[in-house]
Amino acid sequence: MTKFHVKLYAKAVESRKLDQIQKDFEKKFNRKIDVSVEYCYHVITQEPELISSNWEKLVTLLSHSPFETSVWKESQLHPEHGKNIEIGPRTAVKTAACTNILSIFESSGIKNVERIERGIRYLVEDDVDVNEFFEIAADKMTEAIYGNDVKFDDESHQIEKVFLIDVLESKQNLIKANEELGLALDQLDLDFYYDFFVNKVKKNPTDVELFDLAQSDSEHSRHWFFRGEIWIDDRKRDGSLMKTIRETLDSSNDNSLIAFCDNSSAIRGFESVCRLRPNDPTTVSPMIAIFPPSHLIYSAETHNFPTAVCPFQGATTGTGGRIRDIHATGRGAYEIAGTVGYSFGNLNLPGLPLPWEDETFEYPTSISEPAKIAIEASNGASDYGNKFGEPVISGFARSFGQRLENGERCEYLKPIMFSGGIGAIDKDEVRKEPCAPHQKVVKIGGPVYRIGVGGGAASSVSVQGNRENQLDFAAVQRGDAEMGGKLHRVVRACAERIGGNPLMAIHDQGAGGNGNVIKELVEGCGVTVKSDTFQLGDESISLRELWTAEYQENDAALVDASLLDALQTISKREKCHVSVVGEVEKEQRVKLLGKSGEIAVDLDTRQLGEREKKVFKLKSAPRVLKKLELPENLTVRKALKRVLMLPSVASKRYLTCKVDRSVTGLVAQQQCVGPLHTPLADVAVVALSHFDTVGGAVSLGEQPIKMLIDAEKGARMCIAETIMNLIWAPITDLKDVKMSGNWMWAAKCDGEGARLVDAVGALCRGLREIGCAIDGGKDSLSMAVTAHGEVVKSPGTLVLSAYAPCTNVTKVVNPSLKAVPGSKILWIKIGSSEEKMRLGGSALAQVYSQIGDDCPDIENFSEISKVFSIVQQLLNREELAGPLRKPIILAGHDISDGGLLTAILEMAFAGNVSIDIDIKPPNQNIKPIDILFAEECGILLEVSNPENVLHIFSEAGIKCQEIGKASAVFGPDAHVKIHVNGHLEINEKLVDLREEWELVGDRLGEFQTNPKSLKEAREVRRTCQKINYKCDFDWYYNPAFIHNEQYFSTAPRVAIIREEGSNGDREMASAFTLAGFQTFDVTMTDILAGHTLEAYRGVAFVGGFSYADVLGSAKGWAAGVQFNESVSKQFEAFRSRPDTFSYGVCNGCQLMAQLGWIGDEEQKGPTVFLDENECGRFDSSFGPVKIEKNVSIMLSGMENSVLGLWSSHGEGRFTYRNLQNFQNLKTNGQVCIRFCDDRGMTGADHGSVKLPYPWNPNGSIDDVAAICSRDGRHLAMMPHADRSFLTWQWAESSEVPWNARFDQKTVALSPWIKMFRNAYNWCL
């Protein structure tokens, strides 16, 4: 059939990208260039009249704003004195954007479009070299230059046929295939497979079988090293590393439910947790409260190789794969929140040379430069989480690159992209059902693409950089968070289904693709898989690619045949494809049949399971170490200036501000604390429900630079850091703590394997001493790269993730100093004698280009247990302060990178207060630099009753020193004074020190944020004092009706409406339920299928990224309403009914603006549009807003209040068709909420058009945050009241003065609940 390639041109919104291109081009080629830009949409269709018959729809969808027509059939860039260069995604694979636009087209009634991709066309001067421009403007791994004849439907691609590798004739043929196919088989593998095919099964393998086995049996997939037989210096180790790790479970509490046997680990949680879920997820149904036993799960993995090759996509797929690990636990589980970590080489930032970075180091072209990894990997992980709807609530970042004393270069050229996540699982879903004949084998999720081919093998080579770049590129996957979200909703719906979970067992697809995941699924049985049952995204896929590609957002599951219809109904509702690809058979044999019946795979799984352990013979190699030599006359102040710029110490604001930290409404503690939202929290905490205060706590620990000195000491310090980060959340018991251990190590390089073995032994011995245990983890043992002929090893790294049940999420302590009168700051040194102040492996050593020869260690683990126990007791104790309660521990922080001085300063930075400190060394011979910069284990406490606390520690035999206090002098007036033994070492303004700490993060921020916004943020940090919240109304009531099913049968109904890509429906449902409504789960699929809104008094349009916001925020969602006549009429009828109300937040706000539900009703059509944030990116923040006098029914009685509120969006800037429209809104009282500053003042109060960033996070004129309809019934707001209606959801909850009025053991309602209660009362 004839296909037509049509080009449409549109206005491009790429000002930030253009600015960066011009700066980068000038820097690299020493010349300024002028650049103009437009979009070009390449539409592949079989319908010649497609454009003309759908022109109005296409203009609406492809124009940037509803206020202008900016789509053309001809290019608007006319190269009279220049030339056009078009850059777009590589044409071999459909992009995630294409998939989402096609979904929008289908919803809008635009048919017969096979593909649509967007290129960016640039107009540059004639003498600009195309290749040079491409190098600056594009990502070579994912983009290409488009010529006029660019093809997206290359029918000349030949499908590669299955072929045999003739191993029966010669082993050399196997060796040749290993090289040509990039299988990364080592000699042991070659010997095994040669014997397997020649002597056991007596046949030649197909290329598909061999490729399958290479991925499934790779180090990445099977962890041979950790399971293998280890010899060190010709002495056999007693047991495998895995055995040693598993044995830690014997010393901890017996609360593990899943350990080392599923996609995530699980521990016992709480017996009865009230949660909302749909009564029937196959259709529209009420949300009902259930009380199941709810357990905690955690999973962590790294995606290092893909991130090295292609940072953005490598990180997106690492995040997506780990999320699927969470939901594919047991028979289906629920993700709640993520953790992240990035380790990269020297940044070499332009204009900011860091004195410890070696200018002579060269970087290979086959992997990305460290600065690009730091920026784009974090962009990728953040983007995926934002679109999926998973908050990122904890993490780390580290940079290292040095030449060690033995002459070796050690640097994170092979980076670490760490992704972890905590979730929940119901008791009945913990165990997978065993496979049994006649069960259906199904694939759920996205279609098959030629991406991620050979990733398991690629990640398992000893040293990266020796393969062809094309093989490495083929192994990198592509992420599609929209599809990931749809897949997750299917799994969650199955697990929540009251009539029985259709999923008997489920595994996520990862390394090895279908070949690996299906073999896992049918272990103990067999299956015949038919290739023509798969949904293909590319018809030219070969059988080898279909069977082994890691194409993302896909799960395999066993389904009871009687429940298959239920699964397919759920999948249709969630718009997620299900393919039945086979049926379980009794014979233990896995077969793959081609379309013509040819056999591509035929493997006896029993024979494959007989493989023996691999044997690893290692040699130890002592470190060459040198004592730390610091410059003579080095002052504390000079040392501090450098230390504050080290990325592991410096501000991580460039990471936290761009990632959602509030979605789900279950986050009780994320990274940012204090009035300036400073990223310093030690522990991350989530609740299991909006109706309870129990949850889970997570902390991370990693100490790789200390491991360079002594692997055993570094491992023990990892334990210490992890536990001292976790200490600030009340948990059930220290022995309930379980950990994931992730090992990133060049273990196959000389000496490194033995060091890894030492570290494992030290870790496990230490954990047994305190009663904690490892219950899962991963390893990445190919952490070396060839750079210009030199092997560069990344520092051996262990990342520990601890998780435990949290008994009360309202009792968490963070590092922000409160400066309460009478409070004091205490220092507790833990685990070693108080005289030891070792600087080896410290930030101070690194910034002077050394590591030293002796690092901190834990010599007494019992002190860790004692201190942990005491702090836990104190977390749950409070004192009366007049009519209110006051906690004993006001603030707390662990001592880690940067040492004691950095920890003290960070607490002051977060609290924005003055501090006066005097530290008394236990020994007069200890130098100030030693005591201030040593990274010995310890904690700092700000306490309200210092005498009592000192006594408690003394009674337990723990030395605790009072070192000073914080004073209620804030911001620009705050001062920092640090004395050591009475001698003044630091005497500076707080804001000056803090800006030194923010400097490197700000420079990294310039690559992703509007420099104007960064400048404004610096000024805000310098002038902010303390946020003054104000609330004069009463909002509290007892929502006991939650437990009364009969109550909801007569309650007013609210439809919680979501579209594909929405992610804020559960928190929205909880808010309205707590207000007294009966809430219903309603999808746009339901409405398009005929479900009406007649029975509802209210509708709520939820937040998220409908269709990934691919054509602009909520544009696809709006099109599904506007271009479907029956839906459009129904929506308009609901809007016009005088007894109805609506509430839209974030994406829902954008939808209401697109539909014209808010704005100036005197003019037809949309008069309000939410444009891109002025900062140029997604922004997540918690800040004050002011509720104005307004006509909204939901905000009645709340006027003049100043309350804290979460904002999380990329396109939230209110713009208007004209200024008169905006003036009418103000005159009519339709502008309901404005952003304000720490004093409760708006830009107008200061005589300005708007407040600076981040007080105004999106740049809206007049600081507008919410607008309602003329009659007040329809309210749309960008910030999230649906994530701020409980006190513990507030980032500043510990500092809100009215919180102590209420018993936190009941539902801790915040003032925002009045919004929802107002709506309820209006309906009565």
Swiss-Prot record:
Biological processes annotated in GO: 'de novo' IMP biosynthetic process; purine nucleotide biosynthetic process
Main enzyme class: ligase
Entry-linked Gene3D superfamilies: 3.40.50.880, Phosphoribosylformylglycinamidine synthase, linker domain (1.10.8.750), PurM-like C-terminal domain (3.90.650.10), PurM-like, N-terminal domain (3.30.1330.10)
Subcellular location: Cytoplasm
E.C. numbers: 6.3.5.3
Active-site residue list: 1146, 1280, 1282
Pfam families membership: AIRS_C (PF02769), FGAR-AT_linker (PF18072), FGAR-AT_N (PF18076), FGAR-AT_PurM_N-like (PF22689), GATase_5 (PF13507)
Pathway participation: Purine metabolism; IMP biosynthesis via de novo pathway; 5-amino-1-(5-phospho-D-ribosyl)imidazole from N(2)-formyl-N(1)-(5-phospho-D-ribosyl)glycinamide: step 1/2
GO terms for MF: ATP binding; metal ion binding; phosphoribosylformylglycinamidine synthase activity
Binding site for ATP: 314-325, 394-396, 681, 896
Domain called Glutamine amidotransferase type-1: residue spans: 1053-1295
Record's keyword terms, sorted: ATP-binding, Cytoplasm, Glutamine amidotransferase, Ligase, Magnesium, Metal-binding, Nucleotide-binding, Purine biosynthesis
Domain of life (superkingdom): Eukaryota
Disulfide pairings: none
Binding site for Mg(2+): 682, 721, 725, 894
PANTHER family hit by this protein: PHOSPHORIBOSYLFORMYLGLYCINAMIDINE SYNTHASE (PTHR10099:SF1)
Function: Phosphoribosylformylglycinamidine synthase involved in the purines biosynthetic pathway. Catalyzes the ATP-dependent conversion of formylglycinamide ribonucleotide (FGAR) and glutamine to yield formylglycinamidine ribonucleotide (FGAM) and glutamate.
Protein name according to UniProt: Probable phosphoribosylformylglycinamidine synthase
Gene transcribed to yield this protein: pfas-1
